Every structure is written in C-alpha cells, then in structure tokens.
Amino acid sequence: MTTVSEILGINYVVIAPTLALLLTVIVLLFCTITISTPMYVKKYVSFVGILLTLFTIFLKFGLFLTDGVSSYFTEKILLDEFALVGNVLVGMVLLFTFNSFWKTSELIEDKTTEALILILMSASGFLLMIDAENFIMLFIGLEIGSISLYALAGLNRGDQLSNEAALKYFLLGRNCIVEPDSSDIPHFLSG
C-alpha cells in the first residue's frame, strides 16, 4: 500500500537546506523580538544554522547516491548533479563569508541581526531556485531571494543612497511580476 507522501513524492531531505536556513531565521527572529539576547549568542545560532545547512546538503548527496536523478514534490523539485553543485556553492559562500558579513553588518549598529536574517532568507530563496524543476518554483525561489536583497539594500534608512537603491531594485524587480502575468493573458483566454 502506498501512502500519500509516496504518491506525491514528498521527501524533506531534498528541501532540508532551505528548511534549515528558515529554521535559523525563525530562531534569530525569536531571539531578536521576544528576548534580549547578546550578539555572541545570535552569532553562534547563525553559525550553527549554516553548519546545519551544510550537513543537510551532505544528506542530499546520500539521497542522490541511493536514488540517482529524481523528482520530488510532484515534479517541482529536482535532485541532480547540478542542484547538488549549486547547493554546495551557496553553502560554501555562506560559510566562508559569514565572518565578513557579520563584521560589515555591525556598521549598521542596531540592525545587525536584521541584516543577517535578510542574507539567510536570500540564500534560502536561491537554494530553492537552484532545486526548482519548473518555472513556477524557479520564480518563487527568485522572488524569495530578491525581495530579501531589496530589503537589505534599503536597511540603512539614514543613507540616501541606500533608500535610492532599495526603491530602484524594488521597482525594477516588480517588472518581473507584471510582465509574465501580462504575457499569459492570451494563453488564459484561449483555454
């Protein structure tokens, strides 16, 4: 007897790196909003979250070695060599640039954790984009990653250039939504 998860191809190991980053973001948000947590604890939590992401990428290698190239979540997420290489690249960039973006975000004083949360959200969107098998999932991953970067560009509200960059990226990025939607109108009308 097959279960619903087997029919739909649900396997959480495939999206585990994205889920690990989102879990790290939720813990950092909790530490920022509800309780006053020292910066070294937030730095430790984010570093452990990045290591957990790298571990889940390692688990994806094991799944790939047992199942080979496979499709999951009703052909929305693809596990192949290119997705694994992309996941490793994003994970290594997160690991090796962790200290530098922590030091850079300290220049914004009170918004250090917010900058780190936006960077991790952007990375989770790009991980989802790398694993996408169809264009809708690719677009969702791109939007998660890019909206976080738009907010990151405008994080320093006291700087006029930061506000200008955020507005410019936001307006140019919104064109990505308007244009695909307007190009689908003839398709929807024809059935």
Where are these regions (language model features)?
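Alpha-helical transmembrane segments of multi-pass membrane proteins predominantly involved
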Residues: 1-191
